[in-house]
Each structure stands twice: as C-alpha cells, then as structure tokens.
Design a protein with these regions (language model features):
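Bulky hydrophobic segments
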Residues: 1-137
Length: 137
C-alpha cells in the first residue's frame, strides 16, 4: 500500500494542502467582489487535483507494465480507475464541506461548493481520459 502512495506523491501533497487551505480562515482579497469567485476557485482547485490524479495514475500504470506487475493486454481503463480519479476527488470535496461545517467556526459547509467541486472533477474527466491514454503509451 505504501509503495503505491509513493507513486502518487503530488496527489498526497495536494490532498494535504487542500485540506489545510480549506479549513483555515479566508483572508480578505480584492477578488471578493467577483461574483461566484468561491465557486470558480472550487472548480479550478478540484479540476486540477483530479487531473493530477489522472496523470499520476497513468504514470503508475506505465511503470507497473514496465516492471511486469501488470500484463500489457489487460485493460488499463476500468471501473477502479474511474473510482480513483472521479470518485475519490468528489468524496474528498464532500468530506471537506462536512469538516468545514463541523470543525471550524470560520468556515461553513456549502452544498454549492460541493457541486462546484464535482463540476471541477467532471471537467478533469474530459481532460484526464485523453491525458491518461497518452501517458500510458
């Protein structure tokens, strides 16, 4: 299990970074006047997070094939890959909203933020599939 996490170093770092940033108080910024800036931020943050996960999944798959841990003929694109690259980021976004609602006094959980997280993950799906197929080759 631990050796697999080493292949997903950037994803682990991003997970910890997103968790910390989402639980800290929000500083005032001139961008507060931009309508829906919070939702745009969630879409970009989780879209980027999911896309990095797609890239690291492809690189992990490629190294597994090269090391002989996985046969080349097996389908590399399957349900478990979608569960990892789509399911986990959406679940993580929901978990963050629950943590914001229950553990912080400076933040509040918001269903629209969760929806924005999911939209970001779906946008990453559109970019992630071709990226995955390119990197696995």
């Amino acid at each position: 299990m631990l050796h697999r996490l080493l292949h997903f170093r950037l994803t682990v770092l991003l997970t910890l970074g997103i968790l910390v940033v989402c639980l800290l108080p929000v500083p005032e910024t001139p961008l507060e006047n931009v309508r829906f800036i919070d939702k745009y931020t969630h879409i970009l943050l989780f879209g980027g997070y999911a896309w990095v996960l797609w890239c690291e999944s492809a690189l992990y798959r490629r190294s597994a094939v090269r090391e002989g841990r996985v046969e080349t003929g097996r389908r590399s694109f399957n349900r478990s890959l979608l569960l990892l690259t789509v399911g986990w980021p959406v679940l993580f976004g929901g978990l963050i909203e629950v943590l914001q609602a229950t553990l912080t006094t400076c933040r509040s959980g918001d269903w629209l933020d969760f929806l924005a997280d999911a939209f970001g993950v779906l946008f990453a799906l559109a970019a992630g599939i071709p990226t995955y197929r390119f990197l696995v080759r």
